[in-house]
């Protein structure tokens, strides 16, 4: 019986490899490697583009908020600002370096020594103690008075008025850096409109040149803190831009009355102090709608102070409700140091 050779089926791998197939396979491998390199390059370019866009956006924002000083940066990150357990501020050395790199003056983080200073001042053992005394205003701040800067508290007159005095002194220290401003205290508007209504005579002696050292009309901006029932708002006489401005972190619907009172006051003030008649009929009356607004029932006073702080710097109002814990802590530090930064 003859043996028949067994023939098995060939698979692709059994095919003889020709030189042309080898060249084709090698070409495909090189092409695939090139494609992979191209895709990696494309992803790298895309990531770089996104990063550049983010940086450009931050730069653009900084340029918008800086009006008075072109080299001042207004970008900030508020994710690490706030109170912990009621009064401890979250700042690590690494986070501080990052914040300093991106933050401008209005958002300068506190160091450990400053945080300890505030925590000690707010402690129960210092409630009855006079912590600081301001000679020019005769305002004493006790531990009890300072408690209003804890979270969820309404600001009081002493803390508000002392902070305004510190802003005035800050401006005097560096007049080239800030607008020339006048900061009325919290009792001015109450006197101006108390009793039967508007009464210029009640405040006419508040602004003599002998007391101020300057004429009120020569100021760029005049700030008028306003307390209505349990709510703080702000009136602004802007001599630079010839307009009267009203800012309310809530909407109380009384802006028109306040704007008219400020306009009438300016006319009477100029007439009495310089014997001149000023026509404000062409001045603007502005209720600021695009403004930071509070999201609770107790931060109105802090919003008012920050409106003043930012405007006196020549900055637009680039802050929000989430910054309030930080601003409360910073204000406490500045009052304890008797120096606004």
From Swiss-Prot:
Protein name per UniProt: Putative ubiquitin-like-specific protease 1B
Enzyme Commission (EC) number: 3.4.22.-
Listed Gene3D superfamilies: Adenoviral Proteinase, Chain A
Gene Ontology BP term (one): proteolysis
Keyword Transcription attributed: no
Enzyme kind, highest EC tier: hydrolase
Listed Pfam families: Peptidase_C48 (PF02902)
Key words of the record: Hydrolase, Protease, Thiol protease, Ubl conjugation pathway
Gene: ULP1B
SUPFAM superfamilies reported in the protein's UniProt record: Cysteine proteinases (SSF54001)
Active-site residues annotated for this sequence: 231, 248, 300
Stated family: Belongs to the peptidase C48 family.
Function as written in the Swiss-Prot or TrEMBL entry: Protease that catalyzes two essential functions in the SUMO pathway: processing of full-length SUMOs to their mature forms and deconjugation of SUMO from targeted proteins.
GO MF annotations, alphabetized: cysteine-type peptidase activity
PANTHER family linked to this entry: SENTRIN/SUMO-SPECIFIC PROTEASE, UBIQUITIN-LIKE-SPECIFIC PROTEASE ESD4-RELATED
Classification of source organism: Eukaryota, Viridiplantae, Streptophyta, Embryophyta, Tracheophyta
InterPro entries recorded: Papain-like_cys_pep_sf, Peptidase_C48_C
């Amino acid at each position: 019986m003859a043996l028949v050779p067994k023939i098995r089926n060939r698979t692709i791998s059994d095919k003889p490899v020709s030189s042309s197939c080898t060249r084709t396979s090698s070409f495909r491998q090189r092409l695939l490697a090139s494609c992979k390199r191209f895709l990696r390059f494309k992803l790298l370019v895309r990531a770089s583009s996104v990063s550049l866009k983010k940086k450009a956006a931050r730069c653009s924002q900084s340029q918008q908020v800086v009006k008075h000083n072109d080299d001042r940066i207004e970008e900030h990150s508020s994710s690490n600002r706030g109170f912990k357990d009621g009064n401890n501020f979250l700042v690590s050395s690494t986070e501080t370096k990052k914040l300093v790199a991106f933050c401008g003056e209005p958002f300068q983080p506190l160091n450990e020594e400053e945080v300890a200073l505030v925590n000690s001042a707010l402690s129960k053992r210092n409630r009855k103690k006079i912590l600081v005394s301001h000679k020019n205003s005769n305002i004493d701040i006790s531990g009890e008075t300072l408690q209003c800067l804890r979270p969820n508290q309404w600001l009081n007159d002493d803390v508000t008025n002392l902070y305004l005095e510190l802003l005035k002194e800050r401006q005097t220290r560096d007049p080239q850096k800030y607008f020339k401003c006048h900061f009325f205290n919290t009792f001015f508007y109450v006197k101006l409109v108390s009793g039967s209504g508007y009464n210029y005579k009640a405040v006419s002696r508040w602004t003599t040149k002998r007391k101020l050292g300057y004429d009120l009309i020569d100021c760029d901006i005049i700030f008028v803190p306003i307390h209505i029932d349990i709510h703080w708002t702000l009136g602004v006489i802007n001599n630079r831009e010839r307009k009267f401005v009203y800012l309310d972190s809530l909407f109380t619907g009384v802006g028109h009355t306040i704007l008219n009172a400020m306009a009438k006051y300016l006319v009477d003030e100029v007439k009495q102090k310089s014997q001149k008649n000023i026509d404000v009929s062409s001045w603007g009356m502005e209720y600021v709608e695009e403004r930071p607004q509070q999201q609770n029932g107790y931060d109105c006073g802090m919003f008012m102070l920050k409106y003043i702080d930012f405007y006196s710097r020549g900055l637009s109002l680039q802050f929000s409700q989430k910054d309030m814990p930080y601003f409360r802590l910073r204000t406490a530090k500045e009052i304890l140091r008797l120096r606004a930064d």
